[in-house]
Amino acid sequence: MIEYADFECPYCARAHELMTGLAVRRLFRHFPVVSKHPRARVLAQAVEAAALQGAFWEMHDSLFEDQGRLDPPHLWERAKRLGLDLDRFEEDRRSEAVAERVERDFRSGIRAGVTTTPTLFVEGDAHPGVPTTELIDRLATARNGTL
């Protein structure tokens, strides 16, 4: 499954909640919709900076689970709580390499036809919006993490 999402999107947070605990292989792709969510790109870059210290999923989960606190002080608090080197985190977050990683994900979404977040691709089929009960059931019954 490939998931395109935006960390400020409330529908993405709901999708995250529904998919938590599913034993399916997930490829996450950043799709910051900055026209609606001005901090989305900064948050995506923070997740990629955390990834460089081995904490991608931890930062990812933290942002979706508490969208009410996405401002810089809370972002640093999260990084500290995850045990990240804060100087390195900040340097990486502002780096060209991290910005390019986020932009590459976004461009891949455009090429794939993503127009809204979240959008899931399961077995090549696009599923825009919050996943349906049927899709969640299908993902929940996947064997060995694959469909």
Language-model features, listed with the residues they occupy:
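C-terminal cap of thioredoxin/glutaredoxin-like
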Residues: 3-5, 11, 16-21, 77-147
